[in-house]
């Protein structure tokens, strides 16, 4: 019997010829990552046990992303803990205020490459599967262990396969495919499983949209999300890679506990209603819902490709007078590129508030928090009660085109209702 891409990556990092689902292994990691929310606990854990050295300063990434620039004294102190630790240990991949969100920065800068095994103290670490890495979120104490030893103990996950055949409709993106998937299987439909995506529609997506799909695997309970590399992946990685990489592919006779096949041409832009990412409805069934805020950004959809799509909708238009729109590029490089292309001009002229790179309102951090009773349509990845502010606020999830169109009309809208000439 053959093996999946996930099993092959884990086997190589565990020093084994092969591994099987359910097997417990200790695997070498290529990168350990934490942010300003999760790293302080990892650092305190290392200090508690008297661990003076990290296993490899070049294989640790620390990113100040969630509450930056610091919104209060507590968040400033959290950032200082991380900054001081990075300086003390000469951590190679330390990113300070304004550099961006970790899940955008690491692929963008070639720090994560295909075939890597990455653990991060953030649930959306699964993002890197979009370029063919096995990456998964862990707790801060597990992350401390990884930082000290360069290893992680884990159970080999079962794999599920999701095949999207056919061609995508206009305005349908990777965000819609993953929302559709979660809507079909539920928030626990892939519990501790590797979610592997393939098919004609998946292969038509650029790397940015593949990262979006992998990013939201955790919203179905997945241990990871992964798309095997192809020519598009290699083209993306070759421009960025800071180290050698290895391409893995699933065997044709690999075993999957479940296989789903869907016709992508039957899918329209999707919207996840409160209060679960699985509460998915077509945008055509959502246009009666008024909104107070639109948010374009996050590690899910804050890359340059996302901003281009949003700008193509907003060009020459104005945000609805009773709606606010917050745009946050997911990294400094994305911000600079958006400036160079004139996208920031479009956003500001439309009436958007454009912020330095940060997670912002996605997690209810700052720069766009919702009041009681307010509704936001967002390009981010979660819509639990209180996720973006007050427990009695509401968050709706959608792709950048839908969010931008909604900002113009003050209600959830199909992009065709307000579309300008597409910039991409």
Swiss-Prot record:
Gene3D superfamilies the record matches: Aconitase, domain 3
Cofactor(s) listed: [4Fe-4S] cluster
EC number(s) from the headed UniProt entry: 4.2.1.33
UniProt enzyme class: lyase
Catalytic activity: (2R,3S)-3-isopropylmalate = (2S)-2-isopropylmalate
Co-factor remark: Binds 1 [4Fe-4S] cluster per subunit.
Matching InterPro entries: Acnase/IPM_dHydase_lsu_aba_1/3, Acoase/IPM_deHydtase_lsu_aba, Aconitase_4Fe-4S_BS, Aconitase_4Fe-4S_dom, HAcnase/IPMdehydase_lsu_prok, Homoacnase/IPMdehydase_lsu, IPM_dehydratase_rel_enz, IPMI_cat
Keywords tagged on the record: 4Fe-4S, Amino-acid biosynthesis, Branched-chain amino acid biosynthesis, Iron, Iron-sulfur, Leucine biosynthesis, Lyase, Metal-binding
UniProt GO MF annotations: 3-isopropylmalate dehydratase activity; 4 iron, 4 sulfur cluster binding; metal ion binding
A biological process from GO: L-leucine biosynthetic process
Task performed by this protein: Catalyzes the isomerization between 2-isopropylmalate and 3-isopropylmalate, via the formation of 2-isopropylmaleate.
Assembly: Heterodimer of LeuC and LeuD.
Family: Belongs to the aconitase/IPM isomerase family. LeuC type 2 subfamily.
Name assigned to this protein: 3-isopropylmalate dehydratase large subunit
């Amino acid at each position: 019997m053959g093996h999946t891409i996930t099993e092959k990556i884990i086997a190589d990092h565990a020093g084994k010829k092969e591994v099987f689902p359910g097997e417990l292994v200790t695997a070498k990691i290529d990168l350990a990552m934490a942010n300003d929310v999760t790293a302080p606990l990892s650092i305190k854990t290392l200090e508690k046990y008297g661990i003076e050295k990290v296993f490899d300063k070049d294989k640790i990434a620390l990113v100040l992303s969630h509450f930056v620039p610091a919104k209060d004294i507590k968040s400033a102190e959290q950032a200082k803990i991380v900054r001081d630790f990075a300086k003390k240990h000469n951590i190679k991949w330390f990113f300070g205020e304004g550099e961006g969100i970790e899940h955008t920065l690491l692929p963008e800068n070639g720090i994560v490459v295909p075939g890597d095994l990455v653990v991060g103290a953030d649930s959306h670490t699964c993002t890197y599967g979009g370029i063919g890495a096995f990456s998964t979120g862990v707790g801060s104490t597990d992350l401390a262990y990884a930082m000290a030893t360069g290893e992680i103990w884990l159970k080999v996950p079962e794999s599920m396969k999701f095949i999207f055949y056919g061609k995508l409709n206009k305005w349908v993106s990777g965000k819609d495919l993953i929302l559709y998937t979660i809507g079909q299987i539920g928030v626990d439909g892939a519990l501790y499983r590797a979610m592997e995506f393939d098919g004609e529609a998946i292969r038509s997506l650029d790397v940015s949209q593949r990262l979006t799909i992998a990013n939201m695997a955790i919203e179905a309970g997945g241990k990871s999300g992964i798309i095997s590399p192809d020519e598009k992946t290699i083209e993306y990685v070759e421009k960025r890679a800071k180290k050698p990489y290895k391409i893995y592919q699933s065997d044709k006779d690999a075993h999957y506990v479940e296989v789903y096949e869907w016709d992508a041409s039957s899918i329209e832009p999707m919207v996840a209603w409160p209060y679960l990412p699985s509460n998915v409805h077509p945008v055509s069934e959502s246009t009666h819902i008024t909104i107070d805020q639109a948010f374009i950004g996050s590690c899910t959809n804050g890359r340059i490709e996302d901003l281009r799509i949003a700008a193509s909708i907003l060009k020459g238009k104005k945000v609805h007078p009773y709606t606010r729109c917050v745009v946050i590029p997911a990294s400094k490089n994305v911000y600079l590129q958006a400036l160079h292309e004139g996208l920031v001009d479009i956003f500001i002229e439309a009436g958007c508030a454009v912020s330095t790179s940060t997670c912002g309102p996605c997690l209810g951090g700052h720069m766009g928090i919702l009041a009681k009773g307010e509704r936001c349509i967002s390009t981010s990845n979660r819509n639990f009660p209180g996720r973006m502010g007050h427990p009695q606020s509401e968050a709706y999830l959608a792709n950048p085109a839908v969010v931008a169109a909604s900002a113009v009309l003050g209600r959830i809208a199909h992009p065709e209702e307000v579309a300008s000439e597409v910039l991409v």
